[in-house]
Regions:
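Short secondary-structure boundary/capping segments
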Residues: 1, 20-23, 139-140, 304-310
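Solvent-exposed beta-hairpin/edge-strand motifs
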Residues: 139-149, 309-320
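Active-site and substrate-binding clefts of carbohydrate-active enzymes
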Residues: 1-119, 125-127, 156-160, 168-171, ...
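Catalytic and substrate-binding regions of extracellular carbohydrate-active enzymes
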Residues: 72-76, 84-304, 327-332
Length: 356
């Protein structure tokens, strides 16, 4: 006996069988696919370009409105090109190489057009809806600091929300940092290892130690996930770790009235790794810049940060806010989430402080 069959499209089928269906279970929270975890970082240039452009679109729209310019058609056209490249096989990196080349060409074109809309000028504009008073690197060919190979100065803009201002470097007399076996800054007492990892990060204001175990420790593992080479990371990836040697121990590289940079050089059998660590006079932030000549295959690089923070939750930045994730592995579901993603920051905090 043949069952009764009716030909219909997907939309009609879903509407007929799923709409107002009270027997369907509801899922509340983050959807997590227990495979293809490598796509969080595969083709990272694309992910970085996509996120940068998302922010530039906001700036272009805002400045167009404030100037009374009608750029809606142009911005809409550029948005569509960006959204095409957010297709699920493009942005994750699970594609063939020509797709990568096409996407990066699109990103370059979109950014050039957005830069025309945003424009240039002699003043800096704060696009945030609150005062920008965090220490910021401002490019300047005559600057006294170097970041990502570019000269500039570290300044506190102090620009109100949605306002513009000129920025000028201020000079401070006197030493703000003591460099010995322990590095003393206004905020921290820091003990470095030769490979750039931090043996101790003592907070002077709060009177507590933040480092617990390996902190800013570079680790490289053998990465042979099987069928999906560039897309998967196996749960046992830590089983085989690759030796890293220090070719140049950490030492002071550059210093001015706002920032002190320390440099170390590391190497494996085939690759070299330059790590620059920055400490600041007017910021609790510690910045790490990595310059890598990567010639490895089937290897996975990570930086480990063992934090002296007791919390069951981590707050992770996403494209539209943040998400709260568990930090423990009590259940099989939590154990499966050994690899998660976030954008600019991840925050581990107690009531009186934390590490982000």
């Amino acid at each position: 006996i043949m069952p009764k069959c009716t030909h219909m499209g997907g939309a009609e089928f879903l509407e007929k069988n799923l709409a107002d269906n009270e027997n369907l279970e509801m899922w509340d929270g983050e959807l997590y696919l227990e495979m293809h975890r490598g796509t969080f970082t595969t083709k990272s240039d694309m992910k970085r370009a996509n996120r940068r452009l998302e922010n530039k679109f906001r700036n272009a729209e805002m400045l167009s409105v404030l100037r009374g310019e009608d750029n809606r058609d142009k911005i809409t056209s550029l948005y569509k090109k960006l959204l095409i490249n957010q297709f699920h096989d493009i942005l994750p990196g699970s594609h063939i190489h020509p797709v990568y080349e096409d996407a990066m060409a699109d990103y370059k074109e979109i950014e050039a057009e957005l830069d025309k809309i945003i424009g240039t000028g002699s003043k800096y504009f704060n696009t945030l809806n609150f005062k920008r008073d965090a220490l910021t690197f401002v490019p300047n060919k005559k600057g006294t600091s170097t970041r990502y190979g570019e000269k500039g100065n570290w300044l506190i803009p102090d620009i109100p929300a949605l306002s513009s201002a000129s920025l000028r470097k201020t000079y401070v007399n006197g030493e703000w940092i003591e460099i010995d076996e322990t590095v003393e800054t206004p905020y921290y007492s820091v003990k470095f290892n030769g490979d750039g990892s931090i043996a101790s990060l003592y907070d002077k204001e709060l009177g507590r130690e933040w480092a617990d175990g390996d902190f800013n420790k570079l680790k490289i593992y053998t990465d042979c996930p099987g069928n999906y080479d560039a897309w998967d990371i196996l749960p046992n990836y830590k089983d085989k770790q690759i030796d890293i040697t220090v070719s140049k121990p950490l030492s002071l590289f550059e210093k001015d009235s706002e920032c002190a940079s320390f440099l170390t050089e590391l190497k494996t059998e085939k690759s070299t790794w330059t790590m620059i660590i920055r400490l600041f006079r007017r910021s609790r932030g510690i910045e790490v810049e990595n310059i890598v000549d990567w010639n490895e295959k089937h290897k996975l690089a990570k930086a480990e940060f063992g934090c002296n923070v007791l919390t069951r939750k981590a707050l992770c930045d996403t494209s539209a806010g943040f998400i709260e994730r568990d930090t423990h592995k009590n259940t099989s579901w939590q154990q499966a989430r050994f690899e998660t993603c976030h954008h600019k920051w991840c925050d581990l905090a107690e009531t009186d402080g934390g590490v982000a």
